[in-house]
Amino acid sequence: MATKEKQIIDYFDNIGSHFILDGVPIMEVKLPDEVLDEWLNWSKKYRKWKTHNLSFLKDHINKGENTFQISISTNDLENSINLPFTIRLGEYFMHRLHGLSMVRLRKCITLRTHLGHHDNSDYWLNYTNIGDSNPIHVHAGNLSSVIYIDNVEDTPTYFVLEDGREIRYEPKVGYVLIFPSNQEHYVKEKETDKERVTASFNLNFNNTRYDEAKGDSISHEEVIIKK
């Protein structure tokens, strides 16, 4: 394995990245301070749109019933440490879950984007207030996440497994969960007053590019993402 790829693996290993339960493809990762600080700064910066009289035009609309959701701008992403951290995390997740070659994963994990649309990337903030909820849902793309930014301890995240079991995850500020996009999850109605701030991203995995890449050999069948 190339030295740079090993450096990425060692980094995520050393910050305690782990699957939350044996046999369940949900990985918990502690955010480095630099990444969390960016999220905290963005949560303050983008909050101005939450109370804007035209906020509904900028709202990141999905199945969630949060007070306000908004995508991070392309400019902020391109000048961040968050985006490269996210891409490398996606590569690491695929490496650990499926045993894929980090060398061949280069440029195979990308952010899900929507060129020409104001809501131009699947990289967004969620502002949640009392009475808000997020009913059971899945995400688009191949890999998704929940990022816990501020005041998250009073509202668990629930994951529904294929066998019908539910996992109740007690979140902590400064952590991210990454999982396959087809993993069902939900958040019950918020019952406390203080605003909860989380974020999410959706990533794409390019099967064809991986299959054509040079490097360690692995069969195409092993690449397919499953729950």
Give residue ranges: language-model regions.
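Structured alpha-helical
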Residues: 222-223
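Surface-exposed beta-strand edges and flanking loops
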Residues: 31, 72-74, 127, 161-162, ...
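Non-heme Fe(II)/2-oxoglutarate
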Residues: 2-115, 133, 217, 226
